Swiss-Prot record:
Superkingdom, natural source: Eukaryota
InterPro entries: GPCR_Rhodpsn, GPCR_Rhodpsn_7TM, Olfact_rcpt
Family: Belongs to the G-protein coupled receptor 1 family.
Gene3D superfamilies the record matches: Rhodopsin 7-helix transmembrane proteins
Identification of the protein by name: Putative olfactory receptor 2B3
Amino acid sequence: MNWENESSPKEFILLGFSDRAWLQMPLFVVLLISYTITIFGNVSIMMVCILDPKLHTPMYFFLTNLSILDLCYTTTTVPHMLVNIGCNKKTISYAGCVAHLIIFLALGATECLLLAVMSFDRYVAVCRPLHYVVIMNYWFCLRMAAFSWLIGFGNSVLQSSLTLNMPRCGHQEVDHFFCEVPALLKLSCADTKPIEAELFFFSVLILLIPVTLILISYGFIAQAVLKIRSAEGRQKAFGTCGSHMIVVSLFYGTAIYMYLQPPSSTSKDWGKMVSLFYGIITSMLNSLIYSLRNKDMKEAFKRLMPRIFFCKK
């Protein structure tokens, strides 16, 4: 597959908010804090889910996948952004830009599918509790996770090849923090409408189908929870599912804004802020939401922290 055409520059210039110098330091601080929290939070979740036998369940298997994904998601872009801001170095090589684009798209699409799988897990747990162990068996969970990752990377290859093969006529100034589809399409010197239509189709498949399945799942969950007579049971069900719904709303809301409208209609600065939110801030919030709002996770932290830091059995 040819990732480079005759009009491809050797490097790109990432403009970011370079026209607003006063934003550079606050942005650097926000990115550094967010990235630190994301690393600490997601690594902690992964360790607890792996080390605590009580969390060896489908729900926490998928949560471990989500933590790995969020860790990779932010690491793909944030370190380079911090270097660009801190060293006032705005360039990225063509190969680096291609890597950014492929990995960022792949992880984003994988998260879309993984969140849908997690909502199905909650649906089975709440609405089909007697069949939960049979339906959500080890091999089914493994296949669903593998399916999410494979489809995510397959979608990335398709969208990246369509975007990168557009003629750019030497244009190399990317008005963004990193290489993303809407920003790269604006560099093209040809009519992008046919490509935008194809990208829109893939985005509908990856975004709207999973979010529709999630809404259907939570419709059934809400009906089942309202039938629970125990107030404690309702609270536990809403608590577990509420964390997932917050994550879904934050991620899908911002991703749909960016990818289900033509790049030309996206406000330049607003598009950058939305990308920062769903690409970086959401990953940080995921770890906080799942660790602080989840009773099982908090109890597991309390059990494991003494063993980790004081080597007590």
